[in-house]
Amino acid sequence: MQVLQGAEARAALTRTFSQIPVPDAVLSRIEQTFGERLTPEQVVERILLDVRARGDDALRDWTERLDGPRPAELEVPAAELEAAQVAPELHAAIRLAAERVRAFYRQQPAHGFLEHGPDGALGQLVRPLGRVGVYVPGGLAPLISTLMHTAVPAQVAGVPDIVVTTPPGKDGQVHPAILVAARELGLSRVFKVGGAQAIAALAYGTASVPAVDKIAGPGNLFVVIAKRLVYGQTGIESLPGPTETLVVADDSASPRYVAADLLAQAEHNGAEPVLVSVSRELLLAVQAELNEQLENLPEPNRSWARDSVGARMKVVLADSLDEALDLANLYAPEHLCLLTRDPWSLLGQVRRAGGVFVGEASMEALGDYVAGPSHVMPTGGTARFMSPVNVRDFQNIISVVGVNEETLRRIGPAAATLARAEGLEAHARAVESRLK
């Protein structure tokens, strides 16, 4: 285990904001699928253009080519949605998670204001978006939590129309847990479409899939590229990349808990776990725990986690907790876990993070599911300037200007002066026409 310190640690935790590396396996699959060497961007551009031109037919073709059987119908029938069942324990967990996420976001201030005073009326109107598309990744398992952690804030924001897209399984069907979660949230439109083709459908619309005002939800490299390319045609909430967790720990932390929290994220494909501690003894103890816990993980989780730990994990020895928090802010992690003797005393020093998990009872894995805040958080250092999914992501703010004539006469001449300074004579004359 290489332990970084000082300038070496700062250099390792400074983001370069380079493109996400493309694994050789992805490039090989692209060549097998398309019969030529293409970049992921070229693949996505081809899919977007095709869906925009051919609509539902293109969706069926790409789904058959990339995901499995050709879908006869793109939308999950209402009867299938109503009939979906899961084990009672899972259904109860879905219900609890939805309730807690909804309760959390109902506390977020999301109202406008309109002040009537001597100047007239000035204010802001807050209006929900008309239609939102929620993308739920498929892949190896149904990401039930992503649906709840994305759709519920949109519902609390007042969005009247929410549609869901998710890749079908190899049997051509949407996993029943996704359908149960959608039903629990009162969502009635779920489409069996994934990948870049789903993003294209939500952005441009097809005969079956309605175009939306904003697309929300994480996805693989192709989904992220597609969201970036359709931005402007529709809105996007973020461009989430591989997950990351930075743990700040002192000598009071349990090596078992620290290792468990690091591995909880390391089992995600491409994850980057980071440990910053003021105790060399803890670092050594965590290394031993990581080895033991890795061996006890089932496959394929063990291989995924071992890859993340071996290829991307960073271990830092800080001189003080102040330095540890400074390094955390430099890194701007998606998840920041504080496992120290007095974690609440450090909260005031946190300036850049998607989410902060305070104390050993508040493990990040809890936040992934039932704590309350959305787990869709900024990655890749974008927590410097972006926020987790929240109610404001699904609302418009409209400025209201309603000054009276007395105020116009007082401030209008200044407006005309500024307009002429900018070379905009018609602006100045529009103001002066009301002053005569």
Curated annotation (Swiss-Prot):
Entry cofactors: Zn(2+)
Transmembrane segments annotated in the record for this chain: none
PROSITE patterns: HISOL_DEHYDROGENASE
Catalytic site: E334 (proton acceptor), H335 (proton acceptor)
Positions that bind substrate: T243, Q265, H268, H335, D368, E422, H427
Superkingdom of this protein's organism: Bacteria
One cellular-component annotation, GO: cytoplasm
Catalytically driven reaction(s): L-histidinol + 2 NAD(+) + H2O = L-histidine + 2 NADH + 3 H(+)
Sequence positions that bind Zn(2+): Q265, H268, D368, H427
Binding sites annotated in the UniProt record for NAD(+): Y135, Q197, N220
EC number per UniProt: 1.1.1.23
Pathway it works in: Amino-acid biosynthesis; L-histidine biosynthesis; L-histidine from 5-phospho-alpha-D-ribose 1-diphosphate: step 9/9
NCBIfam families the UniProt entry points to: hisD
Family: Belongs to the histidinol dehydrogenase family.
Role of this protein: Catalyzes the sequential NAD-dependent oxidations of L-histidinol to L-histidinaldehyde and then to L-histidine.
Protein name: Histidinol dehydrogenase
Biological source species: Deinococcus radiodurans (strain ATCC 13939 / DSM 20539 / JCM 16871 / CCUG 27074 / LMG 4051 / NBRC 15346 / NCIMB 9279 / VKM B-1422 / R1)
Lineage of the species this protein comes from: Bacteria, Thermotogati, Deinococcota, Deinococci, Deinococcales
